[in-house]
């Protein structure tokens, strides 16, 4: 279903309206004898005593009502105070319970009754109200604001503030107005966002629309309502909690549980300053992070604003988003604006830097941070750091509503005190398009807890107007990193190395430096011939369904069998294939749509076909990195032991233009790989997904234990494959004779995922033990696993690819051309790139130990052109 979200008028705007309205004067009296008699003027209530004190007390129910009604009453109290020009504490507030009052005493009081209060006037007003009906009326010395449900009570309070506190003369002795609110929605919904998104947005929970205790006007505290929505989503197995456009006041830490994403409607701040979904961090001291992320959770599409922050003497109000946990699968942060955070996004910060993390995706994080914009330590496996941008311009452009400071004051403070991006002890990070302007340090490479920074591929950095563009506190001894096609501009230095940093080598190619690198023991190899590719050619398509219609397979008429997630091997016994295919067919006949599989297990005993304009989609809004159990898991049983796995029917075939697969995990329960020393015992399957049409895509999916992952046929022109995780026995991606395609953000493709299957899912078949068989399985992959094979394709673009173990990471054959940026293999058995027939142009290409220790980074009889090639630990 599609929903357009109504924006709640902020109370501050209502006060402005009030000031205008109070100053109005009556029109001139009519002079003609023929004019009808004027309607008698009904007197307005006097809300104050003669001494100026507030006459009315706001009363809410003690027992009948939850925080929704309580917060509605608080909003009315605060709104009345603002309308009268007094502090909120000057308006008394009470519950309807007290010991033994007389009826005469209660009747004599001047009260504003919010919700189902135990007063006769309130009870009489409630009579006959339907679930969506509300009533605002005056009965004697009582102002009644009530409704047939808590959602209706909230709507009544909003209407009272908007229509009556903005013009107190309208609160008359005969006031009586009824209204109707929208009924709370239920179930999963496709969201019609105000601002464009990369994907179709599917929400499992929409807190405001579903009646949770959240307030998009920013008046009431939304902390509890958001937390409850997140917890409810986690209990469903994970998914997306979507906050529609508005301002949500938060006063303490909100924890985002495992496999849950808190998502908003995000306007890119480079395109405007409406911002969409704004988290108003109403804190005056460091209460911890506003959002605390759990393993495999996410934050996406949110803007953070701190109303009590200032630019002259910034206050440490903690992190906007933080991850503290110890575990191999960290969280993901995408599409975030920081208007004026002290600290923006922090992963494993002190004192939690002893906790290792890996497999995070960090993309489109922008804003103004007064101390640190983004910081991460102790990353044990590669993460992708893409499209970050920090500058004073973001807060300055926010305007008066967001307390934009004096330009000179803010710029001076940032230039003297703040750091845009801190990268600590990271292994082989994949870094693309990080920008900083106007900071003391643009990029700070910090010493770490477990390692030091090494093996980085850094491309298209743009650091300008900083004191020091890049400061290197420590780099791992004798290892290498590469920087290409970047601008590093600092008044005191482009790249400055601490004297304590160990000896290492950094390749710098086709970069603009304001100063020569200086200090420390690092050797810089600089090549500015200008021959490398000038920039990465980014994908410009729209990988999403062509229609907003949503087909939820577990609902009627499909009633697809789904087994709730568990780790005892209970996958259910009913085949989900027919019901899912029926939904796919219906979506195709309707011209497109999203076929949604809520979190759980789905047995696939047959084959699925995805028609044109249709997206087959699981729960979530972020990439998959299952350190824990959650999300949508397809159990692949069909296609065991085919005659030719490379050409056998895939479990899922995308046959229509513009169709795709997103947010799914794949598990082959009958493929335990019990004895990795005998590959003939591997249970063979064909490809999991085949793309057999143009403009098709696979994004944000996880492969637990396939023999083969994704096959792109010659029909798959302009395919887009991005943010995959997991492992594979032979080939994860095969591309055959297309005109053009993109493969991006694959990192830490790692054999340990296969071995974790028994512990995570509770298999009933023998399974490798992660502690005993890791070396043997790595040996198998180093011999047989070529991760990406490109054959006969005119141009394939690769960005930010990392494989752990495996054979050749990228194979180029049959005259294909591959242009790759940031390609890395760790402990591979063979080369990072093997070009047998074709052309590779590579920017930042590396491999570490593995094989015989002397295997080249690139090999083959084809043409190989590489800028910044480095072999670590030969």
Predicted regions: what they are:
Residues 19-39:
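Sec-dependent signal peptide cleavage junction
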Residues 264, 295-306, 328-340, 355-372, ...:
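Right-handed parallel beta-helix
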Residues 59-67, 113-118, 146-149, 245, ...:
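Structural motif
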Residues 32-39, 86, 149, 159, ...:
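Extracellular "leader-to-stem" segments immediately downstream of a signal peptide or signal-anchor
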Residues 12-20:
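Bacterial N-terminal signal peptides
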């Amino acid at each position: 279903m599609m929903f357009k979200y109504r924006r709640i008028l902020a109370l501050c705007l209502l006060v402005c309206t009030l000031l205008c309205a109070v100053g109005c004067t009556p029109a001139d009296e009519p002079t003609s004898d023929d004019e009808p008699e004027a309607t008698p003027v009904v007197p307005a209530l006097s809300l104050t005593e003669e001494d100026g004190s507030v006459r009315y007390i706001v009363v809410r129910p003690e027992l009948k009502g939850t925080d929704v009604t309580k917060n509605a009453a608080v909003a009315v109290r605060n709104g009345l105070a603002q309308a009268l020009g007094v502090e909120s504490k000057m308006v008394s507030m009470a519950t309807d319970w007290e010991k033994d009052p007389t009826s005469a005493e209660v009747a004599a009081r001047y009260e504003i009754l919010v919700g189902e209060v135990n007063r006769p006037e309130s009870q009489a007003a409630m009579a006959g109200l339907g679930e969506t009906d509300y009533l605002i009326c005056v009965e004697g010395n009582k102002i009644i604001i009530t409704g047939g449900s808590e959602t209706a009570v909230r709507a009544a309070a909003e209407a009272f503030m908007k229509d009556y506190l903005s013009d107190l003369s309208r609160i008359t002795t005969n006031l009586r107005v009824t209204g109707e609110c929208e009924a709370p929605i239920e179930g999963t919904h496709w969201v019609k966002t105000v601002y464009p998104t990369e994907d179709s947005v599917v929400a499992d929970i929409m807190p405001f629309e579903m009646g949770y205790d959240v307030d998009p006007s920013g008046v009431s505290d939304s902390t509890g309502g958001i937390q409850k929505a997140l917890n409810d989503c986690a209990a469903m197995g994970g998914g997306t909690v979507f906050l529609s456009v508005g301002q949500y006041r938060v006063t303490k830490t909100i924890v985002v549980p495992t496999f849950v994403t808190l998502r908003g409607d995000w306007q890119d701040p480079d395109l405007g300053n409406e911002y969409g979904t704004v988290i108003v961090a109403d804190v005056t001291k460091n209460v911890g992070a506003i959002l605390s992320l759990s393993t495999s959770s996410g934050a996406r599409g949110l803007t953070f604003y701190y109303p009590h922050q200032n630019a002259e003497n910034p206050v440490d109000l903690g992190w906007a988003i933080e991850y503290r946990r110890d575990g191999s699968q960290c969280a993901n942060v995408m599409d975030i604006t920081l208007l004026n955070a002290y600290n923006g996004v922090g992963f494993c910060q002190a004192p939690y830097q002893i906790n290792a993390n890996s497999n995070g995706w960090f993309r489109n994080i922008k804003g103004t941070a007064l101390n640190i914009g983004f910081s991460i330590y102790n990353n044990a496996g590669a993460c992708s750091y893409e499209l970050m941008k920090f500058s004073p311009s973001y807060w300055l452009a926010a305007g008066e509503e967001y307390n934009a400071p004096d330009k000179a004051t803010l710029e001076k403070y940032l230039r003297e005190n703040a750091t845009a991006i801190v990268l600590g002890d990271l292994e082989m990070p994949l870094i693309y398009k990080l920008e900083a302007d106007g900071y003391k340090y643009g990029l700070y490479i910090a010493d770490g807890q477990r390692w030091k920074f090494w093996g980085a591929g850094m491309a298209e950095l743009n650091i300008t107007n900083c004191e020091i563009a890049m400061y290197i506190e420590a780099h791992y001894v004798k290892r290498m990193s590469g920087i290409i096609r970047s601008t590093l501009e600092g008044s005191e230095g482009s790249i400055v190395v601490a004297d304590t940093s160990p000896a290492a080598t950094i390749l710098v190619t086709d970069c603009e430096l304001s100063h020569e690198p200086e200090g420390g023991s690092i050797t810089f190899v600089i090549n500015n011939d200008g021959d490398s590719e000038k920039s990465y050619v980014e994908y410009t398509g729209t990988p999403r369904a062509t229609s907003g219609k949503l087909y939820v397979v577990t609902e009627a008429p499909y009633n697809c069998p789904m087994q709730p997630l568990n780790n005892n091997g209970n996958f259910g016994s009913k085949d989900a294939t027919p019901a899912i295919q029926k939904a796919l067919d219906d979506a195709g006949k309707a011209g497109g749509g999203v076929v949604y599989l809520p979190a759980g297990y789905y047995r696939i005993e047959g084959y699925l076909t995805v028609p044109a304009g249709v997206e087959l989609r699981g729960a979530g809004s972020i990439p998959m990195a299952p350190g824990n159990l959650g999300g949508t898991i397809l159990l692949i049983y069909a296609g065991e032991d085919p005659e030719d796995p490379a050409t056998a029917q895939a479990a899922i075939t995308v046959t229509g233009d513009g169709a795709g697969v997103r947010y799914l995990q794949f598990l082959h329960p009958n493929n335990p790989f019990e004895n990795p020393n005998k590959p003939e015992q591997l249970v063979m399957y064909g490809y999991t997904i085949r793309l057999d049409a143009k403009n098709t895509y696979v994004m944000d999916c996880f492969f637990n234990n396939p023999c083969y992952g994704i096959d792109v046929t010659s029909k798959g022109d302009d395919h887009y494959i991005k943010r995959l995780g997991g492992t594979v026995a032979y080939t994860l991606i095969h591309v055959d004779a297309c005109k053009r395609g993109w493969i991006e953000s694959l990192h830490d493709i790692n054999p340990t995922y296969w071995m974790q299957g028994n512990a995570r899912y509770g298999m009933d078949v023998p399974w490798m033990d992660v502690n005993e068989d890791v070396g043997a399985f790595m040996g198998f992959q180093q011999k047989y696993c070529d991760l990406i094979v490109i054959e006969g394709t005119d141009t394939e673009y690769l960005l930010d690819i990392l494989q752990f173990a495996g054979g050749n990471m990228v194979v180029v054959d049959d005259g294909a051309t591959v242009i790759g940026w940031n390609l890395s293999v760790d402990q591979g058995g063979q080369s990072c790139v093997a070009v047998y027939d074709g052309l590779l142009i590579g920017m930042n290409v590396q491999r570490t130990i593995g094989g015989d220790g002397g295997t080249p980074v690139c090999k083959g009889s084809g043409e190989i052109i590489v800028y910044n090639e480095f072999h670590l630990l030969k």
